[in-house]
A protein has these predicted regions:
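Bacterial N-terminal signal peptides
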Residues: 1-7
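Acidic, polar ligand-binding/catalytic clefts
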Residues: 18, 63, 67, 72-138, ...
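Alpha-to-beta junction loops
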Residues: 71-72, 90-99, 140-142, 179-180, ...
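Bilobed "Venus flytrap"/periplasmic-binding protein-like clamshell domains
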Residues: 44-48, 52-67, 120-176, 191, ...
Length: 300
């Protein structure tokens, strides 16, 4: 059972933080967009991306965009899991999703504004030296990995399933977003294989020094194990003018956005134009015909 809580938080783009929490109610009047708001659909407890204290890097990037556009930044919060878009963007409770793949069929998207990949995270004093899937130290380590994530493909291809401790794709809301990196710190696992923004941010927050190593791209070996993805802003399909406006703000604030990513420890590499999920899927179908592989796993 998934329990979704909804709240609205108003954030003044230029005058600091003003918070007004209201419970969502059935039969509520549909919001009318008067053009003065930059209203973001976000998770209230999903660092490093967002939370209701405005501490996430997507919160900070949204502040930059709202200020550039001269709009009041507001939020509609909903846990980011099944039904997120249905209950937020598509219900017109908000207008902008700060992080999605650029060819998400449910959205109209901006050009990608950053690109990240999966990382290895391990203690600096562990004596381990891990740079890729063939590293000898990886073969003697307990590896924490999110089940069904793309990184499980190279893990399997390199005969490392016996080393794996799988974690659920959908986080238990009783656990903090840092739970996988926390298990490295506690010594429950030796290495975490995790999406870059999660690994980089929580490693930077850790009092225990951690090593963060970007995993080499695996797409050419097995497209289903693709490690790197472009990330865009998304709006409703019909919102052509809104996404054009947002694109202008993204273009004008590239340096500020990169600074935010760096401050949060988000591993990132140059955007690869034209890299998208459907291209990967088509390539995967070709490889499957040749190798009789399985379907592309869900991304994290």
């Amino acid at each position: 059972l998934t329990i979704c809580l909804v709240a609205t938080v108003n954030v003044q783009a230029e005058e600091g933080l003003s918070v007004d929490l209201n419970s969502g109610r059935g039969g509520e009047a549909q919001r009318v967009d008067d053009g003065t708001e930059f209203k973001v659909c976000a998770d209230q407890d999903n660092l490093p991306y967002s939370n209701n204290k405005m501490e996430g890097f997507e919160n900070k990037i949204a502040e930059v965009l709202a200020k550039d556009l001269g709009k009041k930044l507001t939020y509609q919060f909903w846990y980011d899991r099944m039904g997120f878009l249905r209950n937020t963007l598509n219900a017109k409770r908000c207008d902008v999703v700060m992080g999605t793949t650029p060819d998400n069929d449910a959205l109209r998207t901006s050009k990608p504004y950053y690109r990240s990949g999966h990382v290895f995270v391990y203690k600096k004093d562990s004596g381990l030296k891990i740079t890729n899937w063939d590293s000898p130290d990886l073969k003697k380590s307990v590896i924490g990995i999110v089940g069904q994530s793309p990184a499980t493909i190279p893990l399997n291809d390199h005969g490392l399933l016996g080393n794996a401790r799988p974690y659920r794709m959908q986080r238990d809301l009783n656990l903090p977003p840092s739970y996988l990196v926390d298990d490295v710190i506690k010594g429950d696992i030796d290495v975490a294989v995790v999406w870059g923004p999660i690994g980089g941010y929580f490693a930077k927050q850790s009092k225990v020094p951690l090593e963060v190593v970007m995993i080499p791209e695996y797409e050419n070996e097995n497209v289903k194990g693709k490690e790197f993805w472009n990330i865009s802003v998304g709006v409703r399909k019909a919102d052509k003018e809104r996404i054009a406006m947002i694109q202008g703000a993204l273009d004008r604030n590239k340096d500020k956005i990169e600074q935010i990513l760096n401050e949060y420890g988000i591993p990132h590499v140059p955007v690869v134009e034209g890299d998208n999920l459907m291209k990967t899927y088509r390539k995967g179908k070709t490889q499957s015909q040749e190798k009789r592989g399985d379907a592309i796993p869900k991304t994290e």
